C-alpha cells in the first residue's frame, strides 16, 4: 500500500496555528488555488529501524527460547545424572534373588543327578553282604548275578542302590559276579542265563522267584517289599526283560576265597 507525502511551504512565523481552518484559508488565499511544492509517491517499506527493532526483538525471543531449551535440557541432564546416584530399585534386588534361587536349584538337581549316575557296580559290591552270611542270618535275601561288562547291570545300579538303602535293615543284598568261577554252582542252581538276574530268597534260603534284565523299577521294589513283610509269595515271580547273555562271561579264577564279587 502507498501513501501520499505533501511538502508544504508554511510561513516561517512561529505563531502560525496549524488548525484545519487556517490550513483551508492558507490554501485558498495563496493565488486562489492550493499550491503544492512537491508530490511524490513511494512504497511504505518498513523502516530499517523497525526492521532492526523487530530483529532485535526476534533475536531476543529466540535467544530467550534457546535459553529456555538449554535450561530445560540442563535440568533433564542434571535429573538423569542425579538419578544415577539413586539406590537400585527393589525390582533389581528381587531379580537377583530369583536368579540366585534358580542357580541353587539347578546345582542341587545337577548334584543329585550326578550322585545317582555316580553309583557303580563296585559301590553295590562294596555294600553287599557275603553270600554265606546272608544265608545264615535269618533274613530274606536278594541275590543279583551281574558282570562288570553288563550294560543293563550298570544302568540299574542306581535303582538297586536306592532300594538297598531303603530295605537294608530287613533284607540282605548279595552281589555275585558271573565271571568269577567261584559261583559256578550257584549259576547252575539258579539257572542263570542272562544278567542282571535277581533271585528272591525267603528266610530259609528258598527261592520264591526271579526277574531278569531291564524291567520297570516297581518289579524290584514290590518284590523286595513282599520279602521284608514276610509274605508267602512275591508279586513278580517270573519276569524277563532285555538282558545280557551269560555266554559272554569273561571267566577268571578266584583270587580271594572270601570274595563274593
Curated annotation (Swiss-Prot):
Transit peptide residues according to the UniProt entry: 1-40
Cellular compartment(s): Plastid, Chloroplast thylakoid membrane
Entry-linked InterPro entries: Thioredoxin-like_sf (IPR036249), Thioredoxin_domain (IPR013766), TxlA/HCF164 (IPR044241)
One cellular-component annotation, GO: chloroplast thylakoid membrane
Residue span, Thioredoxin domain: 101-229
Region (Disordered): 39-91
Active-site residue numbers: 150 (nucleophile), 153 (nucleophile)
Keyword set includes Disulfide bond: yes
Matches recorded under CDD domains: TxlA (cd02950)
Disulfide feature: 150-153
Gene Ontology molecular function: oxidoreductase activity, acting on a sulfur group of donors, disulfide as acceptor
Biased composition (Low complexity): 63-84
Family as reported in the entry's similarity comment: Belongs to the thioredoxin family.
Function: Thiol-disulfide oxidoreductase that participates in various redox reactions in the chloroplast. Mediates the reduction of PSI-N in the thylakoid lumen. May interact and probably reduce other target proteins of the thylakoid membrane, such as FTSH2, FTSH8, LHCB5, atpA, atpB, atpE, petA and petC. Involved in the biogenesis of the plastid cytochrome b6f complex. Reducing equivalents are provided by stromal M-type thioredoxins and probably transduced through the thylakoid membrane by CCDA. Possesses low insulin disulfide bonds reducing activity.
Protein name from the UniProt record: Thioredoxin-like protein HCF164, chloroplastic
Source organism: Arabidopsis thaliana (Mouse-ear cress)
This protein's encoding gene: HCF164
Amino acid at each position: 500500500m502507498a501513501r501520499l507525502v505533501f511538502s508544504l511551504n508554511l510561513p516561517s512565523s512561529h505563531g502560525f496555528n496549524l488548525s484545519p481552518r487556517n490550513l483551508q484559508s492558507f490554501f485558498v488565499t495563496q493565488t486562489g488555488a492550493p499550491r503544492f511544492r512537491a508530490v511524490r509517491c513511494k512504497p511504505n517499506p518498513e523502516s530499517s529501524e523497525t526492521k532492526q527493532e523487530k530483529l532485535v526483538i526476534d533475536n531476543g525471543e529466540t535467544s530467550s527460547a534457546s535459553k529456555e531449551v538449554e535450561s530445560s535440557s540442563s535440568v533433564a541432564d542434571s535429573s538423569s545424572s542425579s538419578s544415577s546416584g539413586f539406590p537400585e530399585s527393589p525390582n533389581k534386588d528381587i531379580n537377583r534373588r530369583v536368579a540366585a534361587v534358580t542357580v541353587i536349584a539347578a546345582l542341587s538337581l545337577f548334584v543329585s543327578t550326578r550322585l545317582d549316575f555316580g553309583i557303580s557296580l563296585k559301590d553295590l559290591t562294596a555294600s553287599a553282604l557275603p553270600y554265606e552270611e546272608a544265608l545264615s542270618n535269618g533274613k530274606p535275601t536278594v541275590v543279583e548275578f551281574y558282570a562288570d561288562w553288563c550294560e543293563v547291570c550298570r544302568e540299574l545300579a542306581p535303582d538297586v542302590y536306592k532300594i538297598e538303602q531303603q530295605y537294608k535293615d530287613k533284607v540282605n543284598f548279595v552281589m555275585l559276579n558271573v565271571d568269577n568261577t567261584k559261583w559256578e554252582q550257584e549259576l547252575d542252581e539258579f539257572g542263570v542265563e542272562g544278567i542282571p538276574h535277581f533271585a528272591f530268597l525267603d528266610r530259609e534260603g528258598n527261592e520264591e522267584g526271579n526277574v531278569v534284565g531291564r524291567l520297570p523299577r516297581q518289579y524290584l521294589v514290590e518284590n523286595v517289599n513282599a520279602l521284608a513283610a514276610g509274605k508267602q509269595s512275591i508279586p513278580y515271580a517270573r519276569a524277563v526283560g532285555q538282558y545280557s547273555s551269560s555266554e559272554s562271561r569273561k571267566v577268571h579264577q578266584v583270587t580271594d576265597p572270601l570274595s563274593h564279587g
